[in-house]
């Protein structure tokens, strides 16, 4: 499948959240993402690969910890080994060059973006925390049922639990995309993106910031 739109993207590290004042003297909560040392490690084309994309590497890693096939891959691109690699399907892939460095200048203030990351892991959680169940009354005969899920299905009919039943289980630590966030400011000197609102993941989490796929 050939990409039909131009997509810009960077990998970065979530540094945390803070708040800044805007031009209307309103306090805006922002997430700070540091996106330095992004480099093009491979170019995909329709003739060889069947699709058009750019591969971006991010984050330094000890060369001794890189497998020989990956070491050869990075050497071919003329770059030092990178810890994280991601592909972006974009129609303008031919305009990039192997080894080209990318900076936060690919984004501008006011631009709509999507942020992809891994959410915080919560461990094994009950239905009230995991799915927002209201639980049972705190008194009046609710004996040790306060946080229980209730019925999960019939007995002889259907004599099974339907797939997708909301039950207790491991919560978080899943890949999540937050759509249509806004870039509040770009600090080129420090390679920082200030993004309005929250993005998935804990401090220190690697996230992908890309052009929004929906909306403006």
UniProtKB/Swiss-Prot annotation:
One of its GO terms (molecular function) is rRNA binding. Residues 137-158 are annotated as: Disordered. Keywords: Ribonucleoprotein, Ribosomal protein, RNA-binding, rRNA-binding. One of its GO terms (cellular component) is cytosolic large ribosomal subunit. One of its GO terms (biological process) is translation. Belongs to the universal ribosomal protein uL3 family. Part of the 50S ribosomal subunit. Forms a cluster with proteins L14 and L19. One of the primary rRNA binding proteins, it binds directly near the 3'-end of the 23S rRNA, where it nucleates assembly of the 50S subunit. This is Large ribosomal subunit protein uL3. The lineage of its organism: Bacteria, Bacillati, Actinomycetota, Actinomycetes, Micrococcales.
């Amino acid at each position: 499948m050939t990409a039909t739109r131009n997509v810009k993207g960077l990998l970065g590290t979530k540094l945390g959240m803070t708040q800044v004042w805007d031009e209307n003297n309103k306090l805006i909560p922002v997430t700070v993402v540091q996106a330095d040392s992004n480099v093009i490690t491979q170019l995909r084309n329709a003739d060889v690969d069947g699709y058009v994309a750019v591969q971006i590497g991010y984050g330094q890693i000890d060369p001794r910890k890189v497998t020989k096939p990956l070491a050869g891959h990075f050497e071919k691109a003329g770059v030092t080994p990178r810890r994280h690699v991601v592909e972006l399907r974009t129609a303008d892939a031919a305009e990039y060059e192997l080894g080209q460095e990318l900076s936060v200048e690919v984004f501008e203030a006011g631009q709509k973006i999507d942020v992809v990351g891994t959410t915080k892991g919560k461990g094994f959680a009950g239905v009230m925390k995991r799915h927002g169940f209201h639980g049972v009354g705190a008194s009046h005969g609710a004996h040790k049922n306060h946080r229980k899920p209730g019925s999960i299905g019939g007995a002889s009919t259907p004599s099974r639990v339907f797939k997708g039943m909301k039950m207790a289980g491991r919560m978080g630590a899943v890949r999540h995309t937050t759509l249509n966030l806004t870039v509040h400011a770009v600090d080129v000197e420090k390679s920082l993106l200030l993004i309005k609102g929250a993005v998935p993941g804990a401090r220190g989490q690697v996230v992908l910031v890309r052009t929004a796929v929906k909306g403006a």
